[in-house]
Amino acid sequence: MRISLTKTAKPSKKAILWGIAYLIFYQFLFSYVLGFLENFLPEPLDIIEVNLIFSLTNVTAVVLIFRKYLLQTLREARYRIPAILGYALLAVLGTMYLSELVSNLVWQLNPDYYNVNDVGIDLMLLENRPMVILMTVILAPITEELLFRGLIFRSLFDRSKVLAYVVSMCLFSFIHLTNYIGYLDIQWLGLAFLEYLPAAYCLAFAYHNSGSILSPMLVHALVNMISIGLF
């Protein structure tokens, strides 16, 4: 059964402001702060350690910022289990189908294209599989769904459903590319942007229709499990 999102839990204005501030810090400043602090360590951190610190700090900060919203979501969830699970399943299937269509289009536009993020994750999997699973299947879905669906999508939805979809989808896709701006050409970045849109749409769809942020969290976790070969 479809749930009206306007009648469900919503982050407070204070949480929204803190969330926006942290989103900016998380994306544009955190890596520099971490790099500065690393100078005081006796040995440099390896890539797994850096990403784990990044992931744990992000999930802790975001959960603290949105703790009241999360608690209200959990209280509402017991009445929405069928919707949470049902729309999560639809969104996973939709993500796989739409991603395949977009990937085929991308490869037709550039047969040499490959997703740089996926390559990085594959390399980390070879180094420390359990830690990568923790980061991609548990930590990333919580952090990213609270920020992009809970913060961006939900705060815009009451004003405009279309705006909520467009802004959350574009930001979600853009955020996954920022580390490569200046290193990859504009065509490559554009193709990568397109690749993230199906998932961004389906995650917003799951939240919109289930009325619970738990649904896109579940979708995100399952899609990441599939992408790293756990299914």
Annotated model-derived regions:
Residues 18-69, 115-123, 131:
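Alpha-helical transmembrane segments in multi-pass membrane proteins
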Residues 100, 127-231:
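Transmembrane helix-loop-helix hairpins at the membrane interface
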Residues 39-45, 71-140:
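Juxtamembrane helix-loop-helix connectors linking adjacent transmembrane helices
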